[in-house]
């Protein structure tokens, strides 16, 4: 627990009590938060009103409002800070309208890791990743290519970020080591389904699938830092991943050839299929489907874990809206 960290559950409870009472009172407080993102918005009268979000202790995320005539706004607009890296002390007011930040200033003595959710053991996930590669039937040449692309031997910044970064901002595996865990699960899914379906895979195309799955989300190490979008995130992790691949194309072409490089390039570009550049190869489509399968199953599993259901409860207290793959508790109606 972060000393002097903001207790968002208590803050939310206070806001709810103020709303329920119909009171106009405000409650002041302060706390420590890891700066995440902020974006400018406006009130009904067109006055600037940025929206700010940050991580509090235990990985919870919280959103605030910041008025343009307050010191907190000046800090966000003028001072140097790094999203996902800068820890700040905030002074705020709670009212029936929510939480408003009055003042914000950087504070020393805190580590961003103190605010980030840990669900995975990085060593365990690293071992699982290596095991999944061995089980894939990929050639030693493919394993060597992956090792070079992910800089396993050098253990440099690229490798560290791949092993530590989040897989998503707010969906599945949005936690420390989530990217590595998601990638490993995708490899495991592939290992399972390729025994049931032919897909006309041979040694070369199996290598193609394994390498593609291993690096399909590599762009996320540039898109995010500590689960927070960075300056060029608007390019998307697919665009940043393609850029990374071009920088390392010699690794692939020296082991395979130019066509092989572009086949992997197409997977990174198209693995979101209808949500991006549509899949134009079988391999891009397969990676897209495997990626979606893990995202869906991981979201279900995380919801069950968060609710702390027993085995029997998990089987009976969850309902699904298949059209949107949304998860609902049994005691809630879809309308809610």
Set out the residue ranges of the language-model regions.
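Acidic/His-rich, divalent-metal-binding segments that scaffold phosphate/diphosphate chemistry
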Residues: 112-230
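OB-fold/S1-family single-stranded nucleic acid-binding modules
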Residues: 91-122
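Divalent metal-dependent catalytic cores for phosphoryl transfer on phosphate-bearing substrates
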Residues: 198-199, 204-307
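Divalent metal-coordination and catalytic microenvironments
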Residues: 33, 186, 291
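Structural detector for short beta-strands of small beta-barrel domains
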Residues: 25-46
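Short nucleic-acid-contacting surface segments enriched for D/E, G, S/T with interspersed K/R
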Residues: 26-29, 68-91
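OB-fold nucleic-acid-binding modules
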Residues: 1-32
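OB-fold (S1/OB) nucleic-acid-binding surfaces
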Residues: 43-70
């Amino acid at each position: 627990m972060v000393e002097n960290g903001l207790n968002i559950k208590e803050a939310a409870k206070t806001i709810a009590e103020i709303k329920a009472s119909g009171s106009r009172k405000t409650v002041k407080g302060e706390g420590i938060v890891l700066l995440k993102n902020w974006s400018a918005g406006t009130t009904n009268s067109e006055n600037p009103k940025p929206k700010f979000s940050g991580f509090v202790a235990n990985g919870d995320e919280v959103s605030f409002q910041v008025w343009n005539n307050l010191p907190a706004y000046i800090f966000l607009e003028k001072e140097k800070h790094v999203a996902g890296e800068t820890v700040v002390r905030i002074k705020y007011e709670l009212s029936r309208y929510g939480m408003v930040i009055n003042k914000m200033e950087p504070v020393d003595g805190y580590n961003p890791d103190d605010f980030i959710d840990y669900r995975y053991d990085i060593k365990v996930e690293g071992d699982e990743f290596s095991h999944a590669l061995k089980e894939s039937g990929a050639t030693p040449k493919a394993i060597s290519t992956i090792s070079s692309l992910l800089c396993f031997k050098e253990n440099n910044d690229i490798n560290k970020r791949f092993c530590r970064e989040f897989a998503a901002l707010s969906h599945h595996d949005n936690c420390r080591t989530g990217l590595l865990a998601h990638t490993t699960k995708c490899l495991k899914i592939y290992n399972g389904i390729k025994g049931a379906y032919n897909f006309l895979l041979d040694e070369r195309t199996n290598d193609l699938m394994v390498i593609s799955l291993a690096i399909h989300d590599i762009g996320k190490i540039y898109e995010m830092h500590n689960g927070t979008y960075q300056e060029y995130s608007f390019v998307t992790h697919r665009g940043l991943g393609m850029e990374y691949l071009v920088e390392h194309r010699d690794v692939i072409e020296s082991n395979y050839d130019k066509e092989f490089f572009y086949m992997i390039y197409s997977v990174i570009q198209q693995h979101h299929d209808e949500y991006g550049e549509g899949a134009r190869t079988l391999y891009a489509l397969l990676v897209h489907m495997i990626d979606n399968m893990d995202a869906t199953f991981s979201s279900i599993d995380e919801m069950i874990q968060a609710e702390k259901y027993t085995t029997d409860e998990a089987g009976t207290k969850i309902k699904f809206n298949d059209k949107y793959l949304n998860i609902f508790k049994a005691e809630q109606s879809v309308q809610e």
